[in-house]
């Protein structure tokens, strides 16, 4: 299971093993879902409606956007910003899962609450994600800038991007969009962890005995379900975060349509509602849900997989 397990036969991995499992989980997952992330970011940053009826809209559907990006920018465009994204995923995965395991253990040892309860997983998952976000947010800003830029490129390399952004916008640029990120990530990650745990219990209750034997499939399906639920409920805040992160970067967005400036989170929400309507809060939701299902499913799948590998290694070593 994910989180502290007080049962005597529960996994007893070291903190280093937990961090490594989280890092590898993030690395593999990021490589697989990067194309969906690029499409999602392009949709979120487009001010025009995602519709064929709008002649100014550059993108209006997942398949159309995929074809257009492939034709205009080549296959590698789907992995734009992949290096900062991988740094983000490796660091984020390590800090998030390590924090979650430590927090749930702390709750078990220092309170009367059951570390496996929905509410405990929600709070610990949210706090773990906030800790990870504070650690890697500058890399997230870099990833968004790389994924958002068109042709010709504004930033050629990671080093060039860091230097240019620092000189032109100051050190605070690396924490743009932090407020909506923290506001969004707490309930999102909290729901990921708590829904994953609840769906696993539901799966065990609903499935016949034969179906319970395939634990890897269970982890993948429950993780995917948790990703869809959490992303749907918190999506508008993710859109605000992306819009704010590209502030000061408007010249590189000119090829994609309208460009707007926002004074902050509330101003961003107000402008989106006034100029794009309530549906504007959910631009890019379809590729985002697909990405959330795959990324969360793979995240928990690979994390549980590698934790089990380390557990088997530990047990074998202790028996020698």
Curated annotation (Swiss-Prot):
Motif (Substrate recognition) on chain: 241-246
Gene3D superfamilies: Mitochondrial carrier domain
UniProt membrane topology term: Multi-pass membrane protein
Coiled-coil annotated residue ranges, if any: none
Disulfide pairings: none
Membrane-spanning parts: 19-39, 87-107, 122-142, 173-193, 220-240, 293-313
Modified residues (Phosphoserine): 51
Keywords for this protein: Antiport, Membrane, Mitochondrion, Phosphoprotein, Repeat, Transmembrane, Transmembrane helix, Transport
Gene Ontology cellular component list: mitochondrial membrane; mitochondrion
Gene designation per UniProt: SLC25A19
Subcellular localization, as worded in the UniProt entry: Mitochondrion membrane
Function: Mitochondrial transporter mediating uptake of thiamine diphosphate into mitochondria. It is not clear if the antiporter activity is affected by the membrane potential or by the proton electrochemical gradient.
Segments annotated as Solcar repeats: 13-106, 116-202, 214-309
Name of protein: Mitochondrial thiamine pyrophosphate carrier
